[in-house]
């Protein structure tokens, strides 16, 4: 997340604050009638005050982070006079608000010293200055290396809200750097941050929840945060009226839900979580809607949550997000529905809720690879368990859309699309429809894809379509074309040496030989290359030491022998039934 740079310093304008600084320094640097300042200030302090007043007069041209201006400020910092320390801390706060850059320890050490003051005004301004400097990446690391966490943690426990706000804001900025996150988690800061997340002051609450979010980006830090008791607070704050707090808490919980152990804990202790997240999907703020859907997506990695989200009426808001024109909302919604669709009991509710057409439309309405993958994967899941749902997916135009797009989408999308066609091709009733749609025009070329997954899925789809289809005229037509046709695909897979590919090819070949289509069987019989490779496989002796491998190879050999038997070239011994 972005750093929080607006420190809770004062409601005065910048000009007013500069005037305030010079007004405070003026009487200190001058000689009063009763001589109090003259006697209480050391010579070097009086000189530093005088110099600083001059630098402030020309502040636009002055570099306060080095040389004499920094020495003058440092003299005030290490003074025993609290008024001088106040002026120094306020000056640091002002110059860092307008000039944030990488600084060295000579600048940071005086500010860290001021943090240890018992004076509230000094604490407040010093932590504001440190928070401003902590926007710079190099400064973040150096502040922690110089021991800045300890005084900041102490200030988080201050009774003063302004001090709390600045200290938490500074830690929020420090926690955006990867090098600091584990150190912050081990520093004792998590407990105070969690307590301040419940602050009645919205600025403190906002900074604290932002800091907690920054601590959720690694496994170890997430676990420490969970162990420190952050989950109930984050869940409670989902109902905050503040949009930023909602966003920070939703995103933090989304990150926490990445871990299976945390999802289990959430399921055991946070019964209102899903309902709260479903409600936030109807937020008027897109970033909150997006993170709510992503949090539900991560929760839906578990079966329990897949069902609970549907029961909590999560489908209607997800459908609205899916049909949004804002890409991040579409992506978060389609990723969520993809996980929800994994559960067989959710297939029909999702279809009945009206998701099919929007999911099909997403395939062609965006070039976003991730959205396309999630959309077609969801359609495949929805078709997995029943022929009714397979038919509805087909009627929604999924196969036609895949056929139109599959040869020009990225490999990852091709893999998902061919897998979806393979699932739909399991339905005997749909096979003629799929063939009439011309899926061979894309499946056959894709068996020669550069992607092993695309090759395998395409061949599996061809295999499923070859079984009990009734009319094999399309197989006859496409025996040699396109791209080598069915013959070329079988030849490549049989010659591949890959047991899985050989299994698919021989099983497909067996279906074609059992088709009773004389022309098709004639083509196969005349394909000496295919027949010879099947013979070679059938003559193999199993020598695998692994039982699974032995069973798989035995099945391939058995299928090869059955093919040869149907071709009239089988061995004399009894054929093994596969």
Swiss-Prot record:
Extract the GO molecular function terms from the UniProt entry.
identical protein binding; protein-membrane adaptor activity
Provide this UniProt record's keywords sorted from A to Z: Lipoprotein, Membrane, Repeat, Vacuole
Tell me the protein's name: Vacuolar protein 8
Q: Which GO terms describe its cellular component?
A: fungal-type vacuole membrane; membrane raft; Myo2p-Vac17p-Vac8p transport complex; nuclear membrane; nucleus-vacuole junction; phagophore assembly site
Q: Where are the ARM repeats?
A: 58-95, 96-135, 137-176, 178-217, 219-258, 262-301, 303-342, 344-384, 428-467
Pfam families recorded? Arm (PF00514)
Does Lipoprotein appear among the keywords?
yes
In the record, the note on similarity to other proteins reads:
Belongs to the beta-catenin family.
User: A GO biological process this protein is involved in?
Assistant: protein localization to phagophore assembly site
Q: Which superkingdom is the protein from? A: Eukaryota
Q: Which PANTHER family match?
A: VACUOLAR PROTEIN 8 (PTHR47249:SF1)
What is the role of the protein in this entry? Functions in both vacuole inheritance and protein targeting from the cytoplasm to vacuole.
Stated membrane topology is: Lipid-anchor
Which locations, inside or outside the cell, does it occupy? Vacuole membrane
> Which residues lie in coiled coils?
none
């Amino acid at each position: 997340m972005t750093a929080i740079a607006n420190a809770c310093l004062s409601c005065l304008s910048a000009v007013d604050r500069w005037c305030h600084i010079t007004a405070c320094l003026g009487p200190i640097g001058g000689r009063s009638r009763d001589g109090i300042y003259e006697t209480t200030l050391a010579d070097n302090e009086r000189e530093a005050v005088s110099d600083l007043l001059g630098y402030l007069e020309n502040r636009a041209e002055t570099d306060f982070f080095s040389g004499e201006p920094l020495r003058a400020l440092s003299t005030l910092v290490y003074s025993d006079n609290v008024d001088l320390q106040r002026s120094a801390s306020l000056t640091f706060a002002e110059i860092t608000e307008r000039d944030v850059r990488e600084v060295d320890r000579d600048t940071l050490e005086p500010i860290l010293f001021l943090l240890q003051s018992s004076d509230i005004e000094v604490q407040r301004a010093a932590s504001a200055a440190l928070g401003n400097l902590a926007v710079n990446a190099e400064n973040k690391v150096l502040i922690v290396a110089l021991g800045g966490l300890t005084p900041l943690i102490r200030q988080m426990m201050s009774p003063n809200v302004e001090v709390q706000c600045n200290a938490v804001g500074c830690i929020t900025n420090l926690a955006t750097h990867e090098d600091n996150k584990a150190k912050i988690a081990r520093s004792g800061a998590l407990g105070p941050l969690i307590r301040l997340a419940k602050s009645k002051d919205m600025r403190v609450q906002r900074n604290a929840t932002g800091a907690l979010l920054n601590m959720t980006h690694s496994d170890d830090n997430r676990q420490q945060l969970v162990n420190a008791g952050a989950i109930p607070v984050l869940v409670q704050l989902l109902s905050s009226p503040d949009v930023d707090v909602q966003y920070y808490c939703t995103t933090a919980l989304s990150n926490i839900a990445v871990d299976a152990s945390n999802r289990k804990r959430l399921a055991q202790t946070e019964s209102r979580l899903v309902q709260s997240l479903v409600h936030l999907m109807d937020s008027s703020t897109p970033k909150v809607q997006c993170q709510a859907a992503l949090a539900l997506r991560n929760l839906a990695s578990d079966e329990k949550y897949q069902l609970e989200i549907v029961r909590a009426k999560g489908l209607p808001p997800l459908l609205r997000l899916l049909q949004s024109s804002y890409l991040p909302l579409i992506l978060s919604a389609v990723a969520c529905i993809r996980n929800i669709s994994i559960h067989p009991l959710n297939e029909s509710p999702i279809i009945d809720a009206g998701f099919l057409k929007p999911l099909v439309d997403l395939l062609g309405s965006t070039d976003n690879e991730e959205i396309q993958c999630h959309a077609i994967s969801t359609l495949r899941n929805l078709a997995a368990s029943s022929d009714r749902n397979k038919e509805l997916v087909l009627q929604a135009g999924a196969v036609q859309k895949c056929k139109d797009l599959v040869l020009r989408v990225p490999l990852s999308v091709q893999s998902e699309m061919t897998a979806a066609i393979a699932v739909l091709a399991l339905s005997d009733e749909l096979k003629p429809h799929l063939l009439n749609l011309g899926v061979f025009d894309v499946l056959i070329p894709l068996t020669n894809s550069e992607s092993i997954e695309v090759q395998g899925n395409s061949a599996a789809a061809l295999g499923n379509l070859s079984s009990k289809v009734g009319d094999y005229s399309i197989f006859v037509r496409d025996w040699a074309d396109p791209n080598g046709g069915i013959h070329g695909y079988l030849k490549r897979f049989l010659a591949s040496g890959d047991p899985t590919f050989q299994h698919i090819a021989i099983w497909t070949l067996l279906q074609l030989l059992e088709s009773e289509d004389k022309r098709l069987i004639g083509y196969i019989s005349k394909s000496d290359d295919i027949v010879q490779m099947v013979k070679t496989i059938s003559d193999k002796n199993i020598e695998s030491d692994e039982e699974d491998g032995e069973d798989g190879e035995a099945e391939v050999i058995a299928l090869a022998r059955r093919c040869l038997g149907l071709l009239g070239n089988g061995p004399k011994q009894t054929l093994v039934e596969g």
